[in-house]
């Protein structure tokens, strides 16, 4: 890496914007360029104990979160108009900060949801219920842009049912993945004990969850296979999907899900979705209820008592390596961003992003687009027609 300075007048010197403090110049850049360019980053900016990783981007995010924390703490400490955005944000923050109430309640707030699951009488009722709740038990359903026609949105159906995300965590015997798998098993047991089950009953629940998730993992696509866009795109009618999943009524499922006008879907991974449909339609009902119960319980842990939050943290340590829990106000901020992201964003903009800042950013973007247009004009290998199309695409940026 070479930096030049240029003299424009006798007294004016423009210098490079490169931060030499983070560079490790004792290393030959030809041997290890990453170490050479940023090897001293951890020395000048050590990783906080509550962070799983630390980069210049997470450093900026951390500074931004401190501003956001000050904003929300101020909102939460005042009387806000009932029904206002501020009132919603303040209520969520104060609820998370009320450790006495949360510890007294334990997992009681989630029990009514678990009771509804356990009251389901048959597989058809189970499918109808998970659709009405927009819950993805053995595959994922949602709306997004059509990968081959961004002008339209389409219902996407993808493989799912793996709480650990990757199939490798269930199937690989590599030391790192096995460590996570063993930690996950213990995490399930510990969580059910927090719910009030004894160790034997909790272990039985864990074995059921692992049986179903491992079965899904065996047919799920690997991370490498998921990178092939063509192999993960199968657009079809709902009738065609029904033929691929005998015994599973997609038309009714989509109506119950709230997508009653849907006639076409995009199925990313056909075989895992087929297995998920077969298991939901014809699988052991009690096993399905246990899996859904676990997914519901697991998703609630971060919102419950200190013991529940600590259990979640201890398990996640096996994957992310954070040495300490985040402060409660940071956890509250994270929950705000999960539940009320758009609201928090609006309040942040009102306080920290005035109109003149927006105008500056818009001017910067216009200058960038103009610069790119100049670069297009300078390309000798491009025909005039190609340049015209390139500029049309460029001018569509916003």
Question: What is each PLM-predicted segment?
Answer:
Residues 44-49, 78-84, 196-205, 376-390:
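Surface-exposed patches in mature extracellular/periplasmic domains of secreted proteins
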Residues 28-31, 36-100:
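Active-site-surrounding "flap" and adjacent substrate/cofactor-binding loops of secreted or lumenal enzymes
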Residues 41-44, 164, 215-225, 370, ...:
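Secretory-pathway/luminal and periplasmic proteins that interact with or process carbohydrate-rich
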Residues 74-363:
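Noncatalytic, helix-rich "gating/capping" subdomain that lines the substrate-entry/channel surface
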Residues 16-27, 168-176:
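Extended, non-catalytic structural segments that build the interaction scaffolds
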Residues 217, 355, 359-398:
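Contiguous, non-catalytic segments that form substrate-binding/exosite surfaces or channel walls
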Residues 1-13:
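Bacterial Sec-dependent N-terminal signal peptides
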């Amino acid at each position: 890496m070479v930096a030049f300075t240029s003299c424009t007048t006798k007294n004016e010197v423009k210098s490079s914007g490169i931060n030499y403090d983070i560079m490790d110049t004792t290393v030959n850049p030809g041997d290890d360029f990453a170490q050479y360019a940023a090897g001293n980053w951890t020395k000048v900016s050590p990783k906080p104990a509550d962070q799983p990783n630390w980069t210049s981007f997470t450093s900026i995010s951390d500074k931004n979160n401190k501003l956001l924390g000050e904003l929300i703490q101020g909102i939460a400490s005042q009387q806000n108009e009932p029904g206002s955005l501020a009132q919603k944000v303040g209520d969520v923050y104060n609820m998370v900060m009320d450790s006495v109430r949360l510890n007294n309640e334990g997992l009681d707030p989630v029990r009514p949801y678990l009771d509804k699951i356990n009251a389901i009488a048959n597989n058809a009722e189970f499918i109808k219920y998970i659709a009405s709740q927009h819950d993805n038990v053995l595959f994922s359903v949602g709306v997004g842009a059509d990968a081959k026609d961004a002008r339209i949105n389409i219902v996407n159906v993808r493989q799912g049912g793996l709480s650990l995300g990757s199939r490798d965590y269930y199937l690989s015997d590599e030391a790192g993945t096995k460590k996570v798998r063993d930690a996950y098993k213990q995490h399930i047991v510990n969580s059910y004990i927090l719910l009030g089950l004894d160790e034997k009953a909790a272990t039985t629940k864990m074995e059921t969850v692992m049986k179903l998730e491992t079965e899904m993992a065996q047919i799920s696509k690997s991370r490498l296979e998921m990178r092939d866009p063509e192999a993960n795109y199968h657009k079809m009618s709902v009738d065609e999907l029904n033929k691929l999943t005998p015994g599973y009524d997609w038309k009714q499922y989509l109506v119950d899900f709230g997508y009653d006008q849907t006639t076409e879907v995009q199925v990313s991974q056909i075989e895992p979705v087929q297995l998920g449909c077969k298991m939901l339609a014809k699988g052991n009902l009690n096993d399905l209820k246990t899996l859904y119960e676990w997914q519901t319980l697991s998703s609630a842990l971060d919102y419950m008592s200190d013991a529940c939050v600590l259990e979640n943290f201890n398990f996640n340590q096996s994957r992310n390596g954070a040495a300490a829990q985040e402060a409660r106000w940071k956890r509250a901020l994270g929950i705000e961003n999960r539940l009320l992201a758009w609201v928090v964003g609006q309040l942040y903009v009102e306080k920290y992003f005035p109109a003149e800042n927006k105008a500056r950013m818009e001017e910067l973007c216009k200058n960038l687009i103009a610069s790119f247009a100049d670069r297009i004009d300078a390309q000798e290998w491009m025909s005039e027609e190609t340049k015209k199309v390139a500029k049309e695409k460029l001018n569509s940026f916003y």
